[in-house]
Amino acid sequence: MTEVLLEGLVIGESARWHDGRFWCANWGAQEVLAVDASGKREVMARVPTTIPFSIDWLPDGRLLVTSGPEGLLLRQESSGELVTHADLSSYGGLNELVVDGRGNAYVNGGCDFQPGPGERPGFILLVTPDGSVRRVADELAFPNGMVITPDNSTLVVAESFGGVLTAYDVADDGSLSNRRVWAPHPGDGMCMDASGAIWTPGWTPSGESACLRIAEGGDILDTVPLEHAGFACTLGNGTLHMLTADWHLDEPFDTNLDRLLTTPTGRILTHRTSTPKAGYP
């Protein structure tokens, strides 16, 4: 059974499980939230940007935040202050973020809502623990959520406009190679479970919003129906946490955003599941 944990978000994104609580970005409110099992929310950071922004953590526990329109990767210090971890503005706007078990931060971007015919402007950047930056993937059709396997050997990224989950091998130096289709399904903010399947918001074959558990190759293993569009999900404490909002696919981006800023419909939903989370984030 699916239950409502919290209502009143603008657009919840970047679902994470960290230190025994559910965390997310509350787009439109400039907030990073942590929410406990009773639905009590705490603002953990305020991000001076619009949208998008995404979150993850370095191995030492410091929070990283992508400030998308500004092209910055921010880091939260012990004082709570957000400082620049890496200036990536020369590459363009940023979207999603994942940090692997070695402290490598992968940041994607180039998410053009109206690319030219045949254009795939998306990219993935690697920010290593020593601060160096390099571009490790190109030609992505609106890169979105990413996951990395527990052994740090494979990265999977959702190409929302390409309608596929795309996988890469990860080398010891963090480079990506051997691009391939992991599953022929679109995705958004996603997570991996201990069986190697991926949970992601998506759509049923009949076009209804749902959170899907997908096996490598594309088989749908489980489906959790959703009333509104799903944006991201994660696993924690035996529970699938899902972020939804009343986004209308037939309306322009600005129309949706204006409506949701006026009447927030964002929710955190929960659904019990037996297979625990694995990998990163």
Question: How does the language model describe each region?
Answer:
Residues 23-46:
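Beta-propeller domains
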Residues 1, 39-43, 79-84, 127-134, ...:
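Beta-strand initiation motifs
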Residues 6-19, 47-67, 89-112, 121-123, ...:
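Beta-rich, blade/repeat-based domains predominating
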Residues 27-28, 68-69, 112-122, 160-163, ...:
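Short, solvent-exposed loop/turn segments at conserved positions within beta-propeller repeat blades
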Residues 31-33, 71-74, 122-125, 164-166, ...:
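A short loop-to-beta-strand structural motif that recurs across blades of beta-propeller domains
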Residues 232-281:
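Blade-level signature of beta-propeller repeat domains, shared across WD40, Kelch, NHL, RCC1
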Residues 35-36, 75-78, 128, 169, ...:
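Structural recognition of the beta-propeller blade-terminating site
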Residues 168, 176, 181-216:
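Loop/turn-rich, solvent-exposed surfaces of beta-rich toroidal or solenoidal domains
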